C-alpha cells in the first residue's frame, strides 16, 4: 500500500515537472541570434563605355580637366539606365584618323576595353581637315580636300572594323566635326562648305555599318550658344566675335557649355537608337 502511494506520488511529481518545464519554455521568449546574415543587395551591373578620338574626346577646353563630354555622358547614361557606365577615355589631342587607327592597332589596353565595351563614341576627322586648311590657308579650295577625304574615309572604315574585331555588335557613335572659324571669318565660305562635305562623307561612310550612328554637332557650336551671333568683343574700333560655346583661350575647342551641348546631342542619339542594339 505504501509502495502504491509512493508510485502514485512519483508519477504525480514527474507529471507536474513536465508540465512546469513545458509552460516555462513556452512563456520564455526565444533569444535572437547575435549575428544575423545580412540580406545580399543586388549587385549593380557595370558597363564599359570606351571613348576614342582626338582632343574633343580628351576634353581640351574643359575647365574641370575631367575629360569634356565623356564623364558627363557616362553619368547621364548611368542615371537614365539600369547599371553603372564606366568611361574609359582614349582621347589624344591632335590625333588624325591615321594616328587613331595606329593606336587602335597597337594599344593592347584599348583592344581589351573594346572587347568588353557596351558602347563607344568616336571623335575623328577634325585634325585631318585642319591640316589641309593650314597647308592651303591662303588659297584654300574644295579641291584641296579631295585626296585627304579619301584617305580619311578609308581610315574611318578600318577604325570601325578593328574596334569591333572582338565585339562585332558594339554600338558606335561617330561625332561630326564643326567650323570654329565661322564667327570671325564668315566670308571663308569654302571652309564651311568643306566641313559640311566632310560630315556628309562621314555619315555616308558609316551608313554601310549596322549599329554605327552619326551625331552632328556643327549646328550646335559654330554659331555660338544662341545660334546667331555669339558674344562681341569691341577693341580699337574692331569687333571680333567670340564664340561663347568655345574655349576662350584658343577659340577652337569647346568650353564647358560646348561640351554639355555635345553630351546632350550624343545622349539623345543613344536614347533614340538603343532599341536597335543587338
Predicted regions and their residues:
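Surface-exposed cleft-lining segments at the edges of enzyme active sites
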Residues: 92-93, 97, 129, 136-151, ...
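Structural recognition of the beta-strand scaffold that forms the well-ordered cores
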Residues: 48-51, 86-91, 118-123, 171-176, ...
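Hydrophobic membrane-insertion alpha-helices, especially the h-region
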Residues: 8-26
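Histidine-centered active-site loop/cap adjacent to the catalytic His
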Residues: 238-278
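Substrate-gating cap/lid alpha-helix
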Residues: 16, 180-219
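Serine-esterase "nucleophile elbow" of acetyl-processing enzymes
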Residues: 28-91, 110-112
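Oxyanion-hole/transition-state-stabilizing segment in secreted/luminal serine hydrolases
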Residues: 102-147
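Mobile gating loops/cap/lid regions near enzyme active sites that modulate substrate access
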Residues: 217-249
Amino acid at each position: 500500500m505504501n509502495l502504491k502511494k509512493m508510485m502514485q506520488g512519483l508519477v504525480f511529481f514527474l507529471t507536474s515537472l513536465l508540465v512546469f518545464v513545458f509552460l516555462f519554455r513556452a512563456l520564455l521568449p526565444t533569444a535572437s541570434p547575435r549575428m544575423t546574415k545580412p540580406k545580399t543587395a543586388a549587385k549593380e551591373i557595370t558597363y564599359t563605355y570606351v571613348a576614342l578620338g582626338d582632343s574633343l574626346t580628351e576634353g581640351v577646353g574643359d575647365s574641370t580637366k575631367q575629360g569634356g563630354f565623356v564623364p558627363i555622358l557616362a553619368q547621364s547614361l548611368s542615371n537614365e539606365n539600369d547599371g553603372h557606365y564606366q568611361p574609359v577615355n582614349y582621347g589624344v589631342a591632335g590625333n588624325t584618323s591615321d594616328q587613331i587607327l595606329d593606336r587602335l592597332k597597337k594599344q593592347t589596353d584599348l583592344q581589351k576595353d573594346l572587347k568588353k565595351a557596351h558602347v563607344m563614341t568616336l571623335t575623328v576627322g577634325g585634325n585631318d581637315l585642319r591640316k589641309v586648311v593650314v597647308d592651303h590657308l591662303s588659297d584654300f579650295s574644295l579641291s584641296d580636300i579631295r585626296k585627304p577625304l579619301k584617305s580619311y574615309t578609308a581610315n574611318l572604315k578600318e577604325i570601325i572594323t578593328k574596334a569591333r574585331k572582338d565585339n562585332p555588335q558594339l554600338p558606335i557613335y561617330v561625332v561630326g566635326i564643326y567650323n570654329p572659324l565661322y564667327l570671325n571669318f564668315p566670308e571663308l565660305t569654302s571652309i564651311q562648305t568643306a566641313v559640311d562635305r566632310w560630315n556628309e562623307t562621314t555619315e555616308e561612310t558609316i551608313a554601310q555599318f549596322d549599329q554605327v550612328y552619326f551625331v552632328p554637332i556643327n549646328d550646335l557650336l559654330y554659331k555660338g550658344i544662341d545660334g546667331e551671333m555669339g558674344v562681341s568683343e569691341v577693341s580699337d574700333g574692331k569687333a571680333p566675335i567670340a564664340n561663347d560655346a568655345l574655349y576662350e583661350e584658343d577659340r577652337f575647342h569647346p568650353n564647358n557649355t560646348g561640351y554639355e551641348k555635345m553630351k546632350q546631342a550624343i545622349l539623345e542619339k543613344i536614347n533614340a537608337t538603343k532599341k536597335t542594339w543587338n
